[in-house]
Swiss-Prot record:
Gene3D superfamilies: dsDNA poxvirus. Belongs to the orthopoxvirus A52R protein family. It comes from the Viruses. This is Protein A52. InterPro entries: Poxvirus_Bcl-2-like (IPR022819), Poxvirus_sf (IPR043018). The lineage of its organism: Viruses, Varidnaviria, Bamfordvirae, Nucleocytoviricota, Pokkesviricetes. Keywords: Host-virus interaction, Inhibition of host innate immune response by virus, Inhibition of host NF-kappa-B by virus, Inhibition of host RLR pathway by virus, Inhibition of host TRAFs by virus, Viral immunoevasion. One of its GO terms (biological process) is symbiont-mediated suppression of host NF-kappaB cascade. Interacts with host TRAF6 and IRAK2. It comes from Vaccinia virus (strain Copenhagen) (VACV). Bcl-2-like protein which targets host toll-like receptor signaling complexes to suppress innate immune response. Interacts with host TRAF6 to activate p38 and subsequently induce the expression of several cytokines such as IL-10. Also associates with host IRAK2 to inhibit NF-kappa-B signaling.
């Protein structure tokens, strides 16, 4: 006698399905593959840790999206708190965001293109790109996203992803990830 039991766990709820129920369900559902794999993308907003399996490009995408749409008035975890500290590095390297806002006319129709052109020029001016240049660039993008959010240009956060891809390669993203991991461990230990 074969007994098939499927167990589905979601949060604090679980569902147990027996073989007979499976057979009944198959009659009414459209054709499906026998085995499906669900990919669950983590929500980094309230993350306190950074694991080796986490992708920095995905984390930055979520960071810019949240910051561009909601700002920092929402509750966020230690990971986003550490990334927010990159804003200070950006101001040290690039000057205040108000100066750049005027210089690049960020609020104009051409503001997004002006910003991308500025990023390209910055990359060309750097002889040897360091991880700290990249950290400053992440901070700069976050500050620019704030400007656009305040002007209700909510969809422009995606331009910051493009800027990051132009400026930072995968090797540097891995270095930034290591720095963030070390900072998070240090904060946890103190």
């Amino acid at each position: 006698m074969d007994i098939k039991i499927d167990i589905s766990i979601s949060g604090d709820k679980f569902t147990v399905t027996t073989r007979r129920e499976n057979e009944e369900r198959k009659k009414y559902l459209p054709l499906q593959k026998e085995k499906t794999t669900d990919v669950i993308k983590p929500d980094y907003l309230e993350y306190d840790d950074l694991l080796d399996r986490d992708e920095m490009s995905t984390i930055l995408e979520e960071y810019f999206m949240y910051r561009g749409l909601l700002g920092l008035r929402i509750k966020y975890g230690r990971l986003f708190n550490e990334i927010k500290k990159f804003d200070n590095d950006a101001e040290e390297q690039f000057g205040t965001i108000e100066e750049l806002k005027q210089k690049l006319r960020l609020n104009s129709e051409e503001g997004a293109d002006n910003f991308i052109d500025y990023i390209k020029v910055q990359k060309q001016d750097i002889v040897k790109l360091t991880v700290y240049d990249c950290i400053s660039m992440i901070g700069l993008c976050a500050c620019v996203v704030d400007v656009w959010r305040n002007e209700k240009l909510f969809s422009r956060w995606k331009y910051c992803l493009r800027a990051i891809k132009l400026f930072i390669n995968d090797h540097m993203l891995d270095k930034i990830k290591s720095i963030l991991q070390n900072r998070l461990v240090y904060v946890e230990m103190s």
